[in-house]
Amino acid sequence: MARIGDGGDLLKCSFCGKSQKQVKKLIAGPGVYICDECIDLCNEIIEEELADADDVKLDELPKPAEIRDFLEGYVIGQDTAKRTLAVAVYNHYKRIQAGEKARDSRAEPVELAKSNILMLGPTGCGKTYLAQTLAKMLNVPFAIADATALTEAGYVGEDVENILLKLIQAADYDVKRAETGIIYIDEVDKIARKSENPSITRDVSGEGVQQALLKILEGTQASVPPQGGRKHPHQEFIQIDTTNVLFIVAGAFAGLEKIVSDRVGKRGLGFGAEVHSKAEIDTQDHFAEVMPEDLIKFGLIPEFIGRLPVVASVTNLDKESLVKILSEPKNALVKQYTRLFEMDGVELEFAEDALEAIADQAIHRGTGARGLRAIMEEVLLPVMYDIPSRDDVAKVVVTKETVDDNVLPTIVPRKPSRSERRDKTA
C-alpha cells in the first residue's frame, strides 16, 4: 500500500496527479508513483498500437493468383481446388478489412456475409495439406479438429467449443489474433445424419453435432473453458467472437458419388434418351457436380450446408501426380530422405522407375499421397538401420526391383582415401 509521505502529505500519481485516496492502487518506483487508472490507460494505448501494427493492409494481402502460385510450390495437382480456396480466402480477409473500415467510418456499410468452405474428395488427395499450407502463407493461427470426437453438449465426448480452444492455443492465447484464424474440421462426413429422415431418437454424434456447430460457423460470442473439457458453472471462460474465423470443413464423403450419379445419370426410353455405361458413370468427376440436395440426401442438415457456401472438390491422384509429389514440391519426400542420408554422409538416389513403382503401390493400397511415406519407410528401413554403423558406403540406389520385389537397395562402396590406402600397404 502507498504510505503517507514525510510532512503528512498524501502520495500522488506522477502522471495524473491524483492522490492515493482518489485511486484504488498506487505503485511506487524509484522516486515516482503510478496509479491503477494510468496503468489501464497505458495498456489501452499499447493494445491499440499493436492492433494497428498487426492489421494486414489490403495491398499487402496476397492476391488469388499469388495464393495459388504459393500452393503450387507445395501441392501437386488439384488446380480447381487451389483456385477456389485462393478466391475464398482472399475474399474472407477482404471482408474482415471492410468490417474494420466500416467501424471507423460513419457511412452505412454493406454487410458482407462469411463464406466458409466445404472440401470434398477421397482420402490422401491433399485436403488437409492445402489448408495447412494456406495458413502457413497467411501467417494466421491454424487449428485442426476431428469431427468424429465431437458430441452435442451433455454427452460423453468433446464439446464443439474445444475446437475454438485449439485455435486460441495456436495463437498463444492471443484471443484477438485467434479471431481471424482458420479452423479445419476433418471427417465432417462422419457426422452425417444416420438416416435421411429425422429420427425421434437423439443422434448425439451426428445431427446433434451439426446443430451445435451452426452458431460458431455463422459467427457468435462463444465461451471457451481455458483448460478444455466440459463446462461447469464455477469456472472462468475465455470469450471469443467467431464472426471472422474462417472454417474449412472436409471429408471423403464415401457414397456421395452414387447419390450424384443417380441424379446426374439420365435415364429414359426412346430415341432421344441419353444412356451412360456404368464405366462412364464411375469415371465422371461427381464431386465437381455436387448440389445441396445431394449433401442433404447424404445426411447433412440444410442449415449446416447453408453455412458452407463455397464448395471445393479434390480428385483422385493419378500415377503421374504421385510421382511428381515424390520429387517436385519444396518439401518432397525424396528431398527429405536425401537430406536424412546426407546427414550420415551418404548419397541417396532414386531411379525414375522406382518412383513409378512407389506410386503404383500407393494406388493399389488406395491410400493416395498419404501412403507414400509409409512405402518409402518400408523400402529404406534396412539401409537406414545399417548405414549409421558403417563408414564404407558412398551411395544408396533405389531401383524398381527394390520396391516391387522387396530387394535391398544397391549400395555403392566408398573409395578409400589416400591415407587409408597407405595404411593398408604399410
Swiss-Prot record:
SUPFAM superfamilies: Glucocorticoid receptor-like (DNA-binding domain) (SSF57716), P-loop containing nucleoside triphosphate hydrolases (SSF52540). InterPro entries: AAA+_ATPase, ATP-dep_Clp_protease_ClpX, ATPase_AAA_core, Clp_ATPase_C, Clp_protease_ATP-bd_su_ClpX, ClpX_bact, P-loop_NTPase, Znf_CppX_C4. One of its GO terms (molecular function) is zinc ion binding. ATP binds at P122, T123, G124, C125, G126, K127, T128, Y129. GO terms for cellular component: HslUV protease complex. GO terms for biological process: cell division; proteolysis involved in protein catabolic process. The keyword Chaperone applies. The keyword Zinc-finger does not apply. Residues 1-54 form the ClpX-type ZB domain. Keywords: ATP-binding, Chaperone, Metal-binding, Nucleotide-binding, Zinc. It holds the Pfam family ClpB_D2-small. Zn(2+) binds at C13, C16, C35, C38. ATP-dependent specificity component of the Clp protease. It directs the protease to specific substrates. Can perform chaperone functions in the absence of ClpP. HAMAP family: ClpX. Belongs to the ClpX chaperone family. Component of the ClpX-ClpP complex. Forms a hexameric ring that, in the presence of ATP, binds to fourteen ClpP subunits assembled into a disk-like structure with a central cavity, resembling the structure of eukaryotic proteasomes. This is ATP-dependent Clp protease ATP-binding subunit ClpX.
